[in-house]
Amino acid sequence: MIDARHTVSTACQFINVPMGIWVDEKGRVVRPAEPAWTTDQTMKIGAKSIVTEGTAYLTALRDWVANGERSKFVLSDEEFARRVKPRSQAEMEADASFKLAVYFHEKGNNDLAQKYWAKAESLNPDDWNYHRQDWSFTPDQAGKKWLEKFQKLDGSYYPKLDIKP
């Protein structure tokens, strides 16, 4: 799916890729946004590493597909609520700024688009989707910009997968 306006990522609180949510047959979200890898991998980049946990995620996903609401990986309402954080004022302003940037870009006003992308990125620097969208317009610089941002991280590039039963 192509989500150029980031409608799905906003609604589901996706801040990086790949991320997933689990939606059951009744339309109920039973697991909120979390990293959704398919392989285990450790990528060393300079002094930092990106660690993915695909085996654990796929094991849980397969259990849910096989067992549905009886899966030990379906979250209780209380645990689900604990994991979904309310959006802060800055995050909501970042989302509005991002949408303005997309609008101005589509209308050909790249100066205003760039202004609002920069605002979105500064208001919610943890949302890598904003940065990636901005970098997509300068593909020759995207890798360099990604590496600079990655090297400045205090924490992890991806949140730790919390998929225990």
Cite the ranges covered by each PLM segment.
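Acidic surface patches and DE-rich sequence motifs
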Residues: 24
